Amino acid sequence: MKSDIEIAQDTKELPITEIAKKVDLQPDEIELYGNDKAKISWKGINRIKQGKKLGKLILVTSISPTPAGEGKSTITIGLGDAISNQLHKNTLIALREPSMGPVFGLKGGATGGGYAQIITMEDINLHFTGDMHALTSAIDTLAALVDNYIYQDNSLELDPNRILLKRGIDVNDRTLRKITIGQGSRFNGIEHEASFAITVANELMAILCLATDIDDLKKRIGNMLVGFSVKDEPVYVKDLGFEGAIAALLSTALKPNLVQTLEHTPAIVHGGPFANIAHGANSVIATNTALHLSDYVLTEAGFGADLGGQKFMDFVSNHLDKRPDAVVVVATVRALKYQAEETTDHLDEENIPALEKGFENLKRHMENMAHYGVPVIVLINKFASDTEQELSKLKELVKADGFECEVVSYHDEGSKGGIKAAEKVVELTNKASDFTSVYEPTDSVEEKISKIAHNIYHAKDIEYSDKAKDQLAEIKKMGKDNLPVIMAKTQYSFTDKKSILGAPKDFTLHVKNLALKNGAGFIVVATGSILDMPGLPKYPAALDIDVDNNGKISGLF
């Protein structure tokens, strides 16, 4: 079988103007970026809000993944193609933009795989329409303005040692996690420690993905907490007057991007916060726009259902025009064997006992999603190494727990690799649902953390570090303890330790620190060892990437 990039490069895309027509976007409602991608204009966004009935919303999430991932984006794209091209229903796919750092690191890109991809994958995985570069510029401009304020005036007596904002770069670079700036004479600024986070982990990314228009964007930027004064008073961006300039840098990036799949299904790709350290969903503008343009919208939540899935249900959906109508949980045979602590070099070997043991992980994710009161189906992403005995056993286990289940092979067959699955998903969206959140908006921070830990992770106890206790007291002092919580946790385990696999229970969850993201409107609760600046592996994907003299790129995946 051809590589992902070979398949993508061999596909003839339609002009993006033709894709826009499929969802009733007019020529003057898109802004072209070449022949194959466009931004949807404010004129288009505002026009489609009027009158049309909202489409059905299908959320795709997954079990706890292996380090290689389980093909959630591939399933989202393939399922969208199947609903569109096999069932002939008006469909739109809404996905996150890939971060460039992991493309050159371990994970690779995020445009699907095989015959279920969004294109052009080189553009989307690298520079695309420039959104990530605009975000990086905005992040670092804000940091520079804050440092200049301290150097030039500092009438609010902002303490340079208590600045909470981080600089940003869309590259995996562990050397930038902690640095000292302003070294040398005072001519170079005020010396103090600083740090970088990868662009998608910055609060401005979360703000971009939650803002509903430019006024909301500007308001959220103004509400960002910069740090504290020497008198222990909070200082916000609006206190310094920088929100207008930063919003101007992001005004174009706020418009969603329109592309297509290999099978020419329209797709909106916009925003990309990580799910293990942020809320892990594409922009609210993208999903709401898709809901107004089509009858069926497929979107995904990052990592497993305990991370992106939980955050989508309890947080993201509060900002959307509607709740999900159905949830798809993606599972793979190999990941379940991994959850049974089978070593990675043996995952391709048939092992029914390991599959049965690892099923406990999938069982918990299914039941967690079902507790939200929305219909749930499991789609098994078929790998070449899966045996018929393993696939049959997994379907049997899922159905015995009361859930629908289908095996799909969108990667190898495109939309034809799961027509029955598409029919079942569409059928599920018509079932009645009774949405229930894990926690109430009026719950305290501690209550919200406790309910997620007990009901989703199945932890017994929660242990707060002294630092976390101090930060919680500080948040309460500022009157911000009514905000939603976003858990930052390893994606590989229900616990805060990535080595504890399966479906553990009655463990202690360790809360290391809390961070107020006032502009985004949530509190990040960090558990275990979570990094917002990844490093590169010993053998980075960059070593396999090349470009020929005609500009044709190879090695991306």
UniProtKB/Swiss-Prot annotation:
It is an enzyme of class 6 (ligase). The keyword Ligase applies. One of its GO terms (molecular function) is formate-tetrahydrofolate ligase activity. Belongs to the formate--tetrahydrofolate ligase family. It comes from the Bacteria. The keyword ATP-binding applies. This is Formate--tetrahydrofolate ligase. PROSITE patterns: FTHFS_1. GO terms for biological process: tetrahydrofolate interconversion. InterPro entries: Formate_THF_ligase (IPR000559), Formate_THF_ligase_CS (IPR020628), P-loop_NTPase (IPR027417). SUPFAM superfamilies: P-loop containing nucleoside triphosphate hydrolases. Pathway: One-carbon metabolism; tetrahydrofolate interconversion. It catalyses: (6S)-5,6,7,8-tetrahydrofolate + formate + ATP = (6R)-10-formyltetrahydrofolate + ADP + phosphate. ATP binds at residues 66-73.
